[in-house]
From Swiss-Prot:
Membrane topology, record value: Multi-pass membrane protein
TM helices/strands, residue ranges: 9-29, 45-65, 82-102, 111-133, 136-156, 165-185, 209-229, 237-257
A Gene Ontology BP annotation from the UniProt entry: GDP-fucose import into Golgi lumen
Catalytic activity from the UniProt record: GMP(out) + GDP-beta-L-fucose(in) = GMP(in) + GDP-beta-L-fucose(out)
GO molecular function: antiporter activity; GDP-fucose transmembrane transporter activity
Descriptive protein name: GDP-fucose transporter 1
Subcellular location: Golgi apparatus membrane
Cited function: Antiporter specific for GDP-l-fucose and depending on the concomitant reverse transport of GMP. Involved in GDP-fucose import from the cytoplasm into the Golgi lumen.
Lineage: Eukaryota, Metazoa, Cnidaria, Anthozoa, Hexacorallia
Keywords from the named record: Golgi apparatus, Membrane, Sugar transport, Transmembrane, Transmembrane helix, Transport
Bias (Basic and acidic residues): 325-339
Domain of life: Eukaryota
Length: 339
């Protein structure tokens, strides 16, 4: 039976609302876990490691549910091959860098400035695509990147003028942006090793991360920090940590669902709008006062990102049309030759 327009609209609205709720909640929850005076645990790698452990456990139970309930067909059977885990290890190393620098950025920067601190992902996408894949970018896309860079620099300047900036947090944000770009590129390279299943790839990435984090935590002294943590036996602490891990896998699922019920373009626009609302919520919640130039820097970053999305979508659509036209012409010529 064909779905009515009203039912389809309600379903899309529900998915987008769920994406916004989970994404914004995850950012605020991670900020709370990483730098709240209530928690007082200076072990960001441990927090990130635990979320990876929770993700692996969640994928295990979701695979069991998938066997029992056929409508849950997104999650593959839980099976780990050490040969495959070793094969995707380079990608897992980039994945560890991505989530580590992301959380370190959030720990050292306010939620309101977090989007600006992480805004260079698009710029690194263009750079890495050219350097690694040898693919050039149109001048329109480069202009969009220039706007993003301008917004980033203005934001850093304005945040610095307020005396609240952490330049280490900015550096972590830049490194996180680089790792996000590298992760996207290497995902395409390694996903065939897991039968092109993004959830199986997430399983192997998080499985490898559980072990890759251990020497890093030992090197930075976080194991001792956790061992002497006064709230280690607190049920509330572990509840918040576990919720953070569950939300981590939930955002992956709801992101894929939002793309499925809308489109990649709509998903990116939704993400940009969500970032704007998240910034306003943070400024309001923490009672922050920002200058007009600070708001302008955010607008430049968000506007440049949205414009880049539109430009790339238009270019991909045009390239697809040209390729389809060439294929049709080739088929016609082939048919005439056979006649």
């Amino acid at each position: 039976m064909k779905e009515s327009l009203l039912a389809k609209s309600v379903r899309i609205a529900a998915v987008v609302a769920a994406y916004w709720t989970i994404s914004i909640s995850l950012v605020f929850l991670n900020k709370y876990l990483l730098s709240s005076p209530d928690i007082k645990l200076d072990a960001p790698l441990f927090v990130t490691w635990y979320q990876c452990v929770v993700t692996v456990i969640c994928l295990f139970f979701l695979s069991l549910l998938g066997d029992r309930y056929p409508w849950i067909d997104t999650f593959p059977a839980f099976h780990i091959k050490l040969s495959v885990a070793k094969q995707v290890l380079p990608l897992s190393a980039v994945f560890v860098g991505m989530i580590t620098f992301n959380n370190l950025c959030l720990k050292n920067l306010g939620v309101s400035f977090y989007n600006v601190g992480r805004s260079l992902t698009t710029v690194f996408n263009v750079i890495c695509t050219y350097v690694i894949l040898g693919q050039s970018t149109s001048y329109k896309a480069v202009i969009c990147c220039a706007v993003i860079i301008g917004g980033f620099l203005m934001g850093v300047d304005q945040e610095g003028s307020s005396g609240k900036i952490s330049y280490s947090g900015v550096l972590f944000g830049v490194l996180a942006s680089l790792c996000v770009s590298l992760n996207a590129i290497y995902t395409k390279k390694f996903i065939p090793a897991v039968d092109n299943n993004i959830w199986r790839l997430q399983l192997y990435n998080n499985f490898n991360a559980c072990f890759l984090f251990l020497p890093l935590m030992a090197l930075l002294g976080e194991i001792g920090e956790v061992a002497h943590f006064p709230n280690l036996s607190s049920a509330y602490f572990w509840l918040m940590m576990t919720i953070g891990g569950v939300f981590g896998i939930a955002i992956g699922y709801i992101t894929g669902l939002q793309i499925k019920v809308t489109s990649p373009l709509t998903h990116n626009i939704s993400g940009t709008a969500k970032a704007c609302v998240q910034t306003i919520m943070s400024v309001s919640y923490f009672h922050e006062t920002k200058t007009a130039l600070w708001w302008l820097s955010n607008a430049m970053v968000l506007g440049g990102s949205m414009a880049y999305t539109r430009v790339r979508h238009s270019e991909m659509k045009k390239a697809h049309t040209i390729q389809a036209s060439k294929d049709d012409k080739a088929l016609q010529e082939d048919g005439q030759t056979k006649v």
